[in-house]
Amino acid sequence: ESPVTFASQQQSISAENCHSNIRIATINLFNFIEPPLAFYDFENIYSHGQWQKKCQWFGELLNQYHPDIVGFQEVFSPEPLKQLATQQGLTHFAIVDSATLVSDYIYQSPVVALASRFPILEVHAIEPDAHLVAAMGLSSQFTFSRKVLRATVDIPQIGACDCYVVHFKSKRPGLALEPHPLGLTLSAPPTLALHSETKLLTEQALGRWASTMQRGAEAALLFHAILARRQSIRYPVILMGDFNDSLSMGALDALTLQGEHLHSNDIKAAGLGHLSDIARLAVFAQYRLQDAYELFIAANMPDNLVHSREHRAATHYYGPKGSVLDYILLSNEFDASDSRSLAQVVDYQTCDRHLVRPEYERDAYSTDHAPVWVELSLRR
């Protein structure tokens, strides 16, 4: 059987199947909940057969791609996931939160998890810095819409590596206007009663922007947490998950902020103006996170960058429109162009066959996202 049956196209230059290579994957499980529990609504319960098909699909995916470290999103039932991962040799498991019981057997707010073939040294839930939350003008109640997991994994020949799993705020607007404005006094001017269509459009416009602001704040505050950790403990970084937006969109800018993006006046004001260009770039490089796909095409297809970017496979479809929402970001230890790197990206797969060529019998209970898989080769 072809080694890429879960991918609709071979996007990569396949590396030698070297056992010392490290394979990383991020998988949105799409309502991974064991019956008789329900997700969001009492009608959303898998039958035993449907649940078996769902577990089988993910088991086959893990068996085929053989990842060493996997970040999962949309976990309602961690125990069955832990068992499924263990069956595939991913015997170390981390989770920092649990789904919320709404009533009886109905759950909402699924969480993220990580499974690893290698020992997990430490597990931590990232919390936003309260001082920065205040400085950004956010509510003191601000928190990540889903807790961010950091697991420090002991990777052979690399050592301790900080692996972050995220599921940023979705684009779905979660805003409902009150039928009557709150705090209205008798002396206040009368408010125009909105028609159904204008009320809906208003809720959508405000709700989408509120979601974007939440997602952007999550990205910036997480970037700060990663920076602070890198400054104190210089472990390599792998950040993976469902970002619910394109990296090229402004909301997620913070995650890939680089030294060359900074204004010279800001650099001088920070007391770094005395550094040469080369020294300054070296200082900032250690805090840089890069899209694994960009690292892959730069190292393996340098003459074909524009074509590779234009033909990147989507990881999610809204109707006919595809978007890349699922990412694996890597620190400079995995950048082939950095002389200090420990490994480089030699393969990149978007496992999208079930989205672009679905077969009901096989794919009906899979996922609405394409898992993303990368292979890292250790530098000799």
Which role fits each region the language model picked out?
Residues 30, 75-76, 169, 243-246:
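Catalytic metal-binding/acid-base residues of hydrolase active sites
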Residues 1-112, 195-199, 219-220, 234, ...:
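N-terminal, active-site-proximal structural segment of metallo-dependent hydrolase catalytic domains
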Residues 34-52, 174-212:
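A solvent-exposed, charged loop/short amphipathic helix patch at secondary-structure junctions
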Residues 71, 75-176:
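Structured beta-strand-rich core segments of catalytic domains in phosphoester-bond hydrolases
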Residues 16-24, 145-200:
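Beta-strand-turn-beta hairpins that frame and shape the catalytic cleft
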Residues 2-12, 125, 133, 137-144, ...:
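Metal-dependent phosphoester-hydrolase catalytic domains
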Residues 90-101, 184-190, 261-264:
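Acidic, His- and aromatic-enriched active-site or binding-groove loops in soluble protein domains
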Residues 44-48, 67-72, 205-213, 239, ...:
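Second-shell loop/turn segments in exported
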